[in-house]
From Swiss-Prot:
One of its GO terms (biological process) is presynaptic modulation of chemical synaptic transmission. Residues 34-255, 304-314, 452-464 are extracellular. Disulfide bonds join C171-C185, C231-C242. Zn(2+) binds at E225, D227, H248. The gene is Glra3. It is a multi-pass membrane protein. The N-terminal domain carries structural determinants essential for agonist and antagonist binding. The channel pore is formed by pentameric assembly of the second transmembrane domain from all five subunits. The cytoplasmic loop is an important determinant of channel inactivation kinetics. Phosphorylated by PKA; this causes down-regulation of channel activity. It comes from Rattus norvegicus. This is Glycine receptor subunit alpha-3.
Length: 464
């Protein structure tokens, strides 16, 4: 009996300790569950659960795989816009590129925050659109002081991806109206590998393209209106989504007025000074003419140094060519004046030479027939035709009168002839003083009306 009583005592003690242990375990479990309800999940645990290895998320597969295409909304913020080069026909721009899409696999409800800003290193863990710039010639990422990238995930699965880029984009230019031209430079955003069955780019509805406040360009005026278009590309590999923005840039003429137009205008006016210089001052007028021609040639070459070698004629080429033509014409004008003013000397020299030949010919005939009969000589010879009638008389002392011995007009003297040609030369200078400025004024009217008004309006109509 004592053994049985002892066994019962041990058994009751065992039950007691077992019950106490169970109660302690239940209390611990309830405490842990209460703690889990009061303390949220840590960010690390949450990210591991959302996109870690155990989450089942595969960054290689796009959202809605084998379903509707992913719509990616794009937005651009322009930090700087410049370095527009005519020779290479490109421009440089610094932008924030923002892309937004929905990935249902990243939707969450366990974490209290409405959005999560993640480290850029997490970009490798999620799917991203394969966007590239179709007209890009060069691009740079920014890593100072860290990668200039932003990744933000929202509760509903929306993903915001922003990156800072510096791009060099091609911009084919039409320089026919240079430097009064308006250029249109484009930026094309295209998918490289996903066709439109998988991915579609769209512009953001509100403020799709933003420009930094106070942004100015050295030579261009960036117009506020920007054309947003779709530029779907068709290749052998399929149809790919593409969107583009067009920037309208109007060139400012201030630099070219100061560096090209005004100097060439003054050179042309300077060439007209020779019209007021005495025609006898040949060294001064020739030096002035040659100097202005050479200066104008140098100016014309300088205007083409910063421009590409195109096959068509630009507005600045027409201006420089006409200015060079006026300067060269002023030099030719003095050549004409000098030629006319020296004509009297040539005429006197010609008369003197002709007179000497005539007298020599008459004397030669006279001596040839001096040995023949006097009657025959008188009947056959008539010296009046050679201007020697007063020197040779007939037998009766009367000067024979031939049919050509009429009343002759006395030629003008050397001084009179010189005065006539000098007056003609001065008249050329006088006419040039009025004709050259008038012709240049007419050219300016046509030039500026055509390029600054008519063609300017045509460009705006084409853009609209």
């Amino acid at each position: 009996m004592a053994h049985v009583r002892h066994f019962r005592t041990l058994l009751s003690g065992f039950y007691f300790w077992e019950a106490a242990l169970l109660l302690s375990l239940v209390a611990t479990k309830e405490t842990n569950s209460a703690r889990s309800r009061s303390a949220p999940m840590s960010p690390s645990d949450f990210l591991d659960k959302l996109m870690g290895r155990t989450s089942g998320y595969d960054a290689r597969i796009r959202p809605n795989f084998k379903g509707p295409p992913v719509n990616v909304t794009c937005n651009i913020f322009i930090n700087s816009f410049g370095s527009i080069a005519e020779t290479t026909m490109d421009y440089r721009v610094n932008i924030f590129l923002r892309q937004k899409w929905n990935d249902p696999r990243l939707a969450y409800s366990e974490y209290p925050d409405d959005s999560l800003d993640l480290d850029p290193s997490m970009l490798d863990s999620i799917w991203k659109p394969d966007l590239f710039f179709a007209n890009e010639k060069g691009a740079n990422f920014h890593e100072v002081t860290t990668d200039n990238k932003l990744l933000r995930i929202f509760k509903n699965g929306n993903v915001l991806y922003s990156i800072r880029l510096t791009l060099t984009l091609s911009c084919p230019m039409d320089l026919k109206n240079f430097p009064m031209d308006v250029q249109t430079c484009i930026m094309q955003l295209e998918s490289f590998g996903y066709t439109m069955n998988d991915l579609i780019f769209e512009w953001q509805d509100e403020a799709p393209v933003q420009v930094a406040e106070g942004l100015t360009l050295p030579q261009f005026l960036l117009k506020e209106e920007k054309d947003l278009r779709y530029c779907t590309k068709h290749y052998n590999t399929g149809k790919f989504t593409c969107i583009e923005v067009r920037f309208h840039l109007e060139r400012q003429m201030g630099y070219y007025l100061i560096q090209m137009y005004i100097p060439s205008l003054l050179i042309v006016i300077l060439s007209w000074v020779s019209f007021w210089i005495n025609m006898d001052a040949a060294p001064a007028r020739v030096a002035l003419g040659i100097t202005t021609v050479l200066t104008m040639t140098t100016q014309s070459s300088g205007s083409r140094a910063s421009l590409p070698k195109v096959s068509y004629v630009k507005a600045i080429d027409i201006w420089m060519a006409v200015c060079l033509l006026f300067v060269f014409s002023a030099l030719l004008e003095y050549a004409a004046v000098n030629f006319v003013s020296r004509q009297h000397k040539e005429l006197l020299r010609f008369r003197r030479k002709r007179k000497n030949k005539t007298e020599a010919f008459a004397l030669e005939k006279f001596y040839r027939f001096s040995d023949t009969d006097d009657e025959v000589r008188e009947s056959r010879l008539s010296f009046t035709a050679y201007g020697m009638g007063p020197c040779l008389q007939a037998k009766d002392g009367v000067v024979p009168k031939g049919p050509n011995h009429a009343v002759q007009v006395m030629p003008k003297s050397a001084d009179e002839m010189r005065k006539v040609f000098i007056d003609r030369a001065k008249k050329i200078d006088t006419i040039s003083r009025a004709c050259f400025p008038l012709a240049f004024l007419i050219f300016n009217i046509f030039y500026w009306v055509i390029y600054k008004i008519l063609r300017h309006e045509d460009i705006h109509h084409q853009q609209d």
